[in-house]
Amino acid sequence: MEKAIQRQRVLLEHLQPIRHHTHDHSSSLTTSICAAGDSAAYQRTAAFGDDVVIVAAYRTAICKSKRGGFKDTLSDDLLAPVLKAVIEKTNLDPKEVGDIVVGTVLAPGSIRAMECRMAAFYAGFPETVPIRTVNRQCSSGLQAVADVAASIKAGFYDIGIGAGLELMTVDNIGRVQQRNTKVDTFAQARDCLLPMGITSENVAQRFGVTRLEQDQAAVNSHQRAAAATASGKFKDEIIPVLTKIVDPQTGKEKPVVISVDDGIRPNTNLTSLGKLKPAFKNDGTTTAGNASQVSDGAAAVLLMKRSVAMKKGLPILGVFRSFAAVGVDPAVMGIGPAVAIPPAVKSAGLDLDDIDLYEINEAFASQFVYCQKKLNLDPEKVNVNGGAMALGHPLGATGARCVATLLHEMKRRGKDCRFGVISMCIGSGMGAAAVFERGDAVDDLCNARVSNNNSFLSKDAK
């Protein structure tokens, strides 16, 4: 933490107006290092009110596709409750929202865009509030949040919503229908068409991730998710959804309220997982038990300028600090987080040691284990409430879901947890990561403004 404070002190000196004093030019932190790294960065400023902050982040429960709680729910009815929640729970006038961006993957783009627009109307938004979708596959929900943060930072609007939605009960993972003959002459293009399970096997084989390591990761995920559920942690982030369940035999509809993740198996153990056969290769190590679940779910995140949140008296859940998207070899797309996290952390002016919590999507245990080992992460900081192997992975919603899970956990931990990272691999060979700061983690070295009446920095300066 001392290193982080020193970096922030030097950073603020770079960003302050020129004064008649000098600072230590021998510092290892320079303006070039402070600037955004690689291809993506989120510039800090010394203007306290210029921070992009999160004031609300909620999700639905995550349910098993085709047989879970949302199997008979329409996509627009799944998205509407979380859009409504971020407005109602903050008492925000919906007409003040500048844009809504929804990450979504599998449904045809134009159809899903209309469904999202319909959901906004159900949630109480007026016709004047626009909405669009974004698709960067498994990172789509996080990309939506990053897009809104960037738009607020650019001054396009002051308030926006980044959301995510996937109804895998209805929208199945598709395949390219008309294969281009050129693809066989471009190895990486060909590998974009590999089934995700085969890329998992490639990671396990290339980097020596064993079946036992993968199964143990799955056990840990289920145990942590079960413990979080039992302790009531997820109640802070889950919005109950009133929907229906249709009896497949009689067709009779039964009204239900879905408020608990239904994919968690508390009794998962190495013995039971060890009996499962490989799902993609006869001699493989990836099984139905150590891969993410196919799921239905939605999530929404309300972002705004800090100055707007302060004016409205809204509590600040988190601060959006940086974002990075990177490309990797499509044949081992699962390594994406190991490549994306370092530049995202660097862009925030931090080191990996400064990060207190991680939410890394568990697309497959093979890639999850590899990324932890590659970055030498403390397992006690990663997916402390379980991940996609236990909760499920509704593709477009996962990134936004992780924002809700991470920020509520950081809030619970308080002063001992300042910075958090969300990351995931992306089909066709990419990775994405974002850095967040706990909302109340402000001091004279962070998010401060220069007081005109005093010679010191104060977060309360006018």
UniProtKB/Swiss-Prot annotation:
Instruction: Write down the InterPro entries for this protein, in alphabetical order.
Output: Thiolase, Thiolase-like, Thiolase-like_sf_Thiolase, Thiolase_acyl_enz_int_AS, Thiolase_AS, Thiolase_C, Thiolase_CS, Thiolase_N
- Compartment(s): Peroxisome
Residues annotated as transit peptide in the record = 1-34
Name the keywords, alphabetized: Acyltransferase, Peroxisome, Transferase, Transit peptide
- What happens biologically when this protein's gene is inactivated, per the record? Strongly reduced benzoic acid (BA) levels and lower benzenoid formation.
Q: Which GO terms describe its biological process?
A: fatty acid beta-oxidation; green leaf volatile biosynthetic process; phenylacetate catabolic process
Taxonomically, the superkingdom here is Eukaryota
Keyword flag Transmembrane helix: no
Q: State which Enzyme Commission number(s) the record gives.
A: 2.3.1.16
**Residues spanning the membrane:** none
Q: Name one GO cellular component term.
A: peroxisome
Which catalysed reactions does the entry list for this protein? an acyl-CoA + acetyl-CoA = a 3-oxoacyl-CoA + CoA
The record's section on Gene3D superfamilies has:
3.40.47.10
A GO molecular-function descriptor: acetyl-CoA C-acyltransferase activity
Main subcellular location of this protein, as a coarse class? other
Keyword Transferase in record: yes
Associated pathway? Aromatic compound metabolism; Lipid metabolism; fatty acid metabolism
Q: What does this protein do?
A: Component of the floral volatile benzenoid/phenylpropanoid (FVBP) biosynthetic pathway. Thiolase that catalyzes the conversion of 3-oxo-3-phenylpropionyl-CoA (benzoylacetyl-CoA) to benzoyl-CoA.
What quaternary structure, including any partners, is listed in this protein's UniProt entry? Homodimer.
Family, as annotated:
Belongs to the thiolase-like superfamily. Thiolase family.
What is the protein name stated in its UniProt record?
A: 3-ketoacyl CoA thiolase 1, peroxisomal
| Gene designation per UniProt | KAT1
